[in-house]
Amino acid sequence: MAVKAPWLGFLLLVSLWGLSTPALLLRRLREHIQKFQESSSLHPGFGLGHGPGAVPKQGWLEQPLDPFNASDRRTFLQRYWVNDQHRTGQDVPVFLHIGGEGSLGPGSVMAGHPAALAPAWGALVISLEHRFYGLSMPAGGLDLALLRYLSSRHALADVASARQALSGLLNVSSSSPWICFGGSYAGSLATWARLKFPHLVFAAVASSAPLSAVVDFSAYNQVVARSLTQVAIGGSLECLAAASTAFTEVERLLRAGPAAQAVLREELGACGSLDLTEDQAELLGALQALVGGTVQYDGQAGAPLSVRQLCGLLLGKWGNRSRSTPYLGLRRAVQIVLRSMGQKCLSFSRAETVAQLSNTEPQVSGVGDRQWLYQTCTEFGFYVTCEGLQCPFSQLPALPFQLELCEQVFGLSPASVAQAVAQTNSYYGGQSPGATQVLFVNGDTDPWHVLSVTQDLGLSEPALLIPSASHCFDMAPMRPSDSPSLRLGRQKISQQLQDWLKDIKKSQS
């Protein structure tokens, strides 16, 4: 029997010591932005998802650890949140916000687009935290024997079970349509929930959903480079060239020997030694993640930098321009990100990364890192590379270097990772999932949109590509500064849901 976990309140799930590896840096950045938006949304005057005095309810569901084996009686407690302040009856729509690879707080039902849509339909808003993340942790730690119960298929079984259990617990009518919302990996889960359980899930809105698993995600940095040239968000060809120049200088200093490396370490506010090639690759990967993360979350509340600001730094538009260089601009960008996220230094130790990811004890700081690495090794890949000759950044860390983590931490070979990725696409259908009544929403500056659906697959599988929008921006709390294209995109989402809900009312009358 799982032990009920206490609510730990608002935790900024960010390491106090440093950022390490590209993937971990992006996770820290995502968590930082998510927590900022969730905590800000609960203050009066921010967002449009709730009224004064609104209090979300927290609950726990007892779920089977292995839903595919009826003889296994082990269970765990899965956390959910409820916002019923706009609910007008038993047969109203239910908006289910599916959690992804991280913790879910009360803001998951109080802020963002699903919560903002609720008043128009008198909808009930629920969020469901993903197994093995946040406080929805099975007892026993994170060793391999337990991680075998962590997969998208297990998560979907949880969604189906929760949908049925919550209908009874919350007195939801059998005629109420359930609409799944999710962003990024959770957007894929929303799609697949509709695909696998059409009798339980009426429709889905999949935001920035990377439906196609891929081992070598070289297209990520191709989109980053293209987005750095977009004038609408403050980019330019000169900005891209400056970014390339900055990385060339970092690589020159790394090759110049110990003295130059010591200077580089001090100037970047980095912690640790650069003696080992593997640590140099980690540093270059972290710097790429900083640039990529700026593009990925451009313009969002809580993001340390925007593309416009980053390009301004790289091009020396602030301060003494005559003394500025792209490398100096990159240094300033690193300092801004570290300061914004409360970091002591930029970490790049491969040995420390492996040790951290090999720790089987659930951690409050850095929660979810080992779990998400396991899912990339056993289902999705998503290893960002920049190995082509046209890459504007560093060609390190290369794909083999990244795949080594799967072997070092879990004993999984590159061949097994490739096989797992192929099986994922075969099972779900990749970018042609064949699910009806799913709206795919993406932003064209988001590097992940190339793995999603950006053109209509049919009348019941529409796609919406929002100009100049970043990752999951449509799900973020509304702000007065939102662009006209983002506002229009949200209106189109609302209209599509209205059309689908009209159809169900016609069929019931």
From Swiss-Prot:
Biological process per Gene Ontology, one example term: proteolysis
Top class in the EC scheme: hydrolase
Primary site of residence: cytoplasm
GO CC annotation: endosome; lysosome
Signal peptide interval: 1-22
Name of the molecule in the record: Thymus-specific serine protease
Short name of any one Pfam family annotated for the protein: Peptidase_S28
Sites where a glycan is attached: 69, 171, 320
Tissue-specific expression: Expressed predominantly in cortical thymic epithelial cells, with highest expression around vessels and the thymic capsule.
Keyword line: Cytoplasmic vesicle, Glycoprotein, Hydrolase, Protease, Serine protease, Signal
Summary of the function given for this chain in its UniProt record: Protease that may play a role in T-cell development.
Transmembrane segments: none
Origin species: Mus musculus (Mouse)
GO MF assignments: serine-type exopeptidase activity
Gene: Prss16
Family classification: Belongs to the peptidase S28 family.
PANTHER family with a match to the protein in the record: PROTEASE S28 PRO-X CARBOXYPEPTIDASE-RELATED, THYMUS-SPECIFIC SERINE PROTEASE
Active-site residue numbers: 184, 446, 471
InterPro entries from the UniProt entry: AB_hydrolase_fold, Peptidase_S28, Ser_carbopepase_S28_SKS
